[in-house]
Amino acid sequence: MIRLVVVDNFDSFTYNLVEYFSEQTVEGEPLDIEVRKNTASLDEIRDLDPDAIVISPGPGHPKNDRDVGVTNDVLTELSTEIPTLGVCLGLEAAVYAYGGTIGHAPEPIHGKAFPVDHDGAGVFAGLEDGFPAGRYHSLVATDVPDCFDVSATTDHDGEALVMGVRHRDYPIECVQFHPESVLTGSGHGVVRNFLTAVAGFDVA
């Protein structure tokens, strides 16, 4: 059984995300899902012995410890060896934790669908290019560090905004949009693809 630890950044969408994962099975078995607030310690997260980690959406900026708590430490200390999916703030935190820059989006977006162009790999494997994705954010990755590939973008008034990143060496994938939103056409596919990668990583 796959043990999934969700780091909750105090977001109303966290349990929608948990529900999406709870609907999935890996090799016929349901997931063992543990949710912990970002006020947990790194040792608490480590002691849960996760096979996979999800970093939830949340308010605030990844540079502020009060906003992200243990999130950045999880990304740099545990996600180097444990498959991790970051969502919204999870992407921003990953980019920031590995030396990138987070800035303001051209305009705050809360609950609008935009087409996502992606590379067809990782969490995007087999998904339609240009599928609609629900955006709920005012921050974006403005400078992505070299250790990440940009895996997805969306066009916002002629400007390409980062919608997905994938670490080149570690099993970290992140999306800026919300796969658990009803506005996202392939959200279940993103979740399934992540779990497929987790299962393969677990066997390796």
Swiss-Prot record:
Entry EC no(s): 4.1.3.27
GO CC terms in record: cytosol
Active site, renumbered: C88 (nucleophile), H178 (for gatase activity), E180 (for gatase activity)
Record pathway: Amino-acid biosynthesis; L-tryptophan biosynthesis; L-tryptophan from chorismate: step 1/5
Reaction(s) this enzyme catalyzes, per UniProt: chorismate + L-glutamine = anthranilate + pyruvate + L-glutamate + H(+)
SUPFAM superfamilies (alphabetical): Class I glutamine amidotransferase-like (SSF52317)
Gene Ontology molecular function: anthranilate synthase activity
Binding-site list for L-glutamine: G58, P59, G60, S138, L139
Key words, A-Z: Amino-acid biosynthesis, Aromatic amino acid biosynthesis, Glutamine amidotransferase, Lyase, Tryptophan biosynthesis
Uppermost EC category: lyase
Pfam families linked: GATase
GO biological process: one example: L-tryptophan biosynthetic process
Glutamine amidotransferase type-1 domain mapped to chain residues: 3-204
Function: Part of a heterotetrameric complex that catalyzes the two-step biosynthesis of anthranilate, an intermediate in the biosynthesis of L-tryptophan. In the first step, the glutamine-binding beta subunit (TrpG) of anthranilate synthase (AS) provides the glutamine amidotransferase activity which generates ammonia as a substrate that, along with chorismate, is used in the second step, catalyzed by the large alpha subunit of AS (TrpE) to produce anthranilate. In the absence of TrpG, TrpE can synthesize anthranilate directly from chorismate and high concentrations of ammonia.
Quaternary structure and partners: Heterotetramer consisting of two non-identical subunits: a beta subunit (TrpG) and a large alpha subunit (TrpE).
Protein name: Anthranilate synthase component 2
Organism: Haloferax volcanii (strain ATCC 29605 / DSM 3757 / JCM 8879 / NBRC 14742 / NCIMB 2012 / VKM B-1768 / DS2) (Halobacterium volcanii)
